[in-house]
C-alpha cells in the first residue's frame, strides 16, 4: 500500500496521463541495462546488448520496457492493493526468473530519472517525492514473494 495525500494522487495521475509509455518504458529499461549492466543477464534472448547504443536502440528492450510501464500504470490504479496487483508478477520473477528483488528498486529509481528528464520543470520536487513513494511501493509489492 502506498500512502499518498489527495493532492499527491492527483499529481501522480495527472503526470501519468501525459506519459508516452512506449517511449518512457523503453528508455527506462534501457537505462537500467546500461547503468546496471549485471541486469542484462535476464535479457540475453534480446540479442545485442553489448553497448549503450545497442541497448537503447534494441527493439526488444523497447517493447519490454513498454510492457513494464503498462504494468506500472496498472499499479497506479491499485495503490491500495499493490501486493495483490503484482502477486503473479512477483511469483514469476521470484520462482521462475530468479530476479534479484533489488532490481525492482533500481528500475523504479531509473524510472524517476527518466520522468524528470522528459518532464523537466513540470516534474517538481514534490511530484518526485510522490513518485518515489509509488516506485518504492511497487518494488516492495514485486519483492513480496521473496519473503
From Swiss-Prot:
Residues carrying Phosphoserine: 45
Residues where N6-acetyllysine is found: 60, 83
Signal peptide stretch: none
Keywords: Acetylation, Heme, Iron, Metal-binding, Oxygen transport, Phosphoprotein, S-nitrosylation, Transport
Family matches, as CDD domains: Hb-beta-like
Source species, domain of life: Eukaryota
Modified residues (N-acetylvaline): 2
Keyword Phosphoprotein tagged: yes
Positions contributing to heme b binding: 64, 93
GO MF annotation, one: oxygen binding
S-nitrosocysteine modified-residue sites: 94
GO cellular component: blood microparticle; haptoglobin-hemoglobin complex; hemoglobin complex
Stretches assigned to the Globin domain: 3-147
A biological process from GO: hydrogen peroxide catabolic process
Subunit structure as annotated in this protein's UniProt entry: Heterotetramer of two alpha chains and two beta chains.
Family statement: Belongs to the globin family.
PANTHER family: HEMOGLOBIN FAMILY MEMBER, HEMOGLOBIN SUBUNIT BETA
Name of this protein: Hemoglobin subunit beta
Amino acid at each position: 500500500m502506498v500512502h499518498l495525500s489527495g493532492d499527491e494522487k492527483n499529481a501522480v495521475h495527472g503526470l501519468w496521463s501525459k506519459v508516452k509509455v512506449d517511449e518512457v518504458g523503453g528508455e527506462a529499461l534501457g537505462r537500467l541495462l546500461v547503468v546496471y549492466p549485471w541486469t542484462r543477464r535476464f535479457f540475453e534472448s534480446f540479442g545485442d546488448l553489448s553497448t549503450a547504443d545497442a541497448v537503447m536502440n534494441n527493439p526488444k528492450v523497447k517493447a519490454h520496457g513498454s510492457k513494464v510501464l503498462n504494468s506500472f500504470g496498472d499499479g497506479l490504479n491499485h495503490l491500495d492493493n499493490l501486493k495483490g496487483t503484482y502477486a503473479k508478477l512477483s511469483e514469476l520473477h521470484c520462482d521462475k526468473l530468479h530476479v534479484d528483488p533489488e532490481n525492482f528498486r533500481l528500475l523504479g529509481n531509473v524510472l524517476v530519472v527518466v520522468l524528470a528528464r522528459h518532464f523537466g520543470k513540470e516534474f517538481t520536487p514534490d511530484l518526485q517525492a510522490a513518485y518515489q513513494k509509488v516506485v518504492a511501493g511497487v518494488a516492495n509489492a514485486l519483492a513480496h514473494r521473496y519473503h
